[in-house]
Amino acid sequence: MVGPESGAPYTVPWSRCDVPGLVRLDIEPHSTPSARKIARAVEVLHDGKVVAYPTDTVYALGCAIESRRGTERIYRAKRMDEHKKLALICPDLSSASMYAHFSRTAFRVARRVFPGPYTLVLPATREVPRLLIDHSHRRRQVGIRVPDHPIALALARALGRPLLTSSAIPPGEERALADPEDVELHFGRHVDLVIHGGPTPGEPSTVLEIIDDEVAILRAGLGPTEGILDT
């Protein structure tokens, strides 16, 4: 098929997959992803649906922060325990500060590691939906990510609010998926759109909990920890 004016090959920005209702969206992981294709994915998110997309660590399942239906579908897809909470993907520190309280230490660490393969567990603000708070703990906390990946950041910016996110780990397995074809195979019937943005490193983010001036490593992952505790 060719374009009517240039004669160049014409490709649609998205296509239907073998799974009924599932849309596949091919986006090259360049520094500036196609705005038209990002808008197509954001349209799905605005509808309260679930999108699988690449990050700087692994593929993830995500929905808009206010989508209770999307949140429930992510939990069902992964067969997650209700006490395991989703994190928030924010485009920058400014937006992240609306949902988490940053102490001086937390701000210094965030400036050092974001954007990058880290999750910071911080005190949650009132903007965080109750369904994201683990009430079995005394503290209201939330996981914050600002990934170093153009597609994930473009989604969060265009959406205008954070993405609820969870690594694409199939039920009964320990490792998250790093390839979009595997995401379709395991989660194609549980999501509405899969962004094919190339392979990811396949290692989880490093998780740091920061309470006041204390920094603790909850999980070692792709992000190095050398020097972080010396803030």
What are these regions (language model features)?
Residues 13-231:
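Active-site-adjacent structural elements in enzyme catalytic cores
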